[in-house]
From Swiss-Prot:
GO terms for molecular function: ATP binding; lysine-tRNA ligase activity; magnesium ion binding; tRNA binding. It comes from the Bacteria. It comes from Paraburkholderia xenovorans (strain LB400). The lineage of its organism: Bacteria, Pseudomonadati, Pseudomonadota, Betaproteobacteria, Burkholderiales. The gene is lysS. This is Lysine--tRNA ligase. Homodimer.
Amino acid sequence: MTEPTQPNAAQPNVVPEVDDNKIIAERREKLRELREQGVAYPNDFRPTHHAEDLQAQYEHSDKEALEANPLEVAIAGRMMLKRVMGKASFATVRDGSGQIQFFITPADVGQETYDAFKKWDMGDIVAARGVLFRTNKGELSVRCTELRLLSKSLRPLPDKFHGLSDQEMKYRQRYVDLIVTPETRKTFVARTKAISSIRKFMADADFMEVETPMLHPIPGGAAAKPFTTHHNALDMQMFLRIAPELYLKRLVVGGFERVFEINRNFRNEGVSVRHNPEFTMIEFYAAYTDYKWLMDFTEQLIRQAAIDALGTATITYQGRELDLAKPFHRLTITQAIQKYAPQYTNEQLADSAFLRTELKKFGVDASQPQFLNAGVGALQLALFEETAESQLWEPTYIIDYPIEVSPLARASDKVEGITERFELFITGREIANGFSELNDPEDQAARFRKQVDQKDAGDEEAMFYDADYIRALEYGMPPAGGCGIGIDRLVMLLTDSPSIRDVILFPHLRRED
């Protein structure tokens, strides 16, 4: 039997240009031959093992141990590398878990199968049965006794040494990116682990997962511009939801004291490294809690998601270390401004005219609709966004938001003009937004009316008046706290991803010409 000696693959410095159209034509001809033979695209092979499981289980088994206790396996996956050596050949095959090497000889699989294998291409989906062993160079491999082609790849994969270098192509053809970029696969595995962790965390805290409408007759729950659509049967305009908040709070009115939803929101706004028109959030509401309880709970949730997704609460983002195990900081808006822009005095931050003048220096147009009747609190928030927000690298809760920019939050009993609201910032990005809920129907109705006035003045992000939600509050909602966490931004943090597109499988892009 041929001794399985693994070759050293040469890595050329210059990769010659290839004609993809010619390669595709050649592969289509191979597929035509397979169709004539009646063996194209079979579906009768069932794997018994996964590559990563075998690599882990037999990591410390040497050649002699494997020969003494032979293990028969059946594995299928994509052929990522093929080396034909004459009387023996190697193939690196990747399944959904990892990769493993196939060792193929005509003596083991038959000359006809071996000759057919020589014609197969990288990217083909192949399957093998055989015995696990270790090569002379120590690589865990499958000595194939049966070898089959399950699916013909008609398009060539990107060059293995350069990968998929076009960033937009990575997003547009995510299926190719997942094939050739291990880091991309790791990112989305971590995303799934984080979401699973969050669901378990919520269940362990006695929250009930629910589903609320995606199509809303009135957009609400956040300050954002909605997507609009038309319901033909009802002949009415509808809106893709910008947030599930008002429906979830209706459920609290109905007696479900702890509810949460993980789902998509849609906002018809700009696209950036932090924004995608379609994004995933968790929103949760708990009766008989307040914003202080929410901050503690949210901190624990994020910490546990990191541990479950990565195995640690200490992470690195863009070259800087973050310890999510440490208590999160808490600052008011003015404290944050003065921490990162200490030149501002308390008197200046309480002066509307000064704030408007200062905002102009940062290029903020104070004549915009949302600023026309803005008070000191809203102007302070705008200055915070210019001076401090991007500096909040360590996890920091910004608390005590002004009432005029918090139409759904409970007003403070201690300080006039502010609410029991927080936003959580990590690496200079907003990750979460929460508050003690406003459950006074008359106060809520008055705030909705102010929002309508702002909308009439030209503020497209101001809220509508939701009469049914007011009616729900009039039945009585218990005191409660609620919070929303951006799943995509959290996963960006956990996976060291600089753009939100890196953590969304199919982000929105301009249509191809």
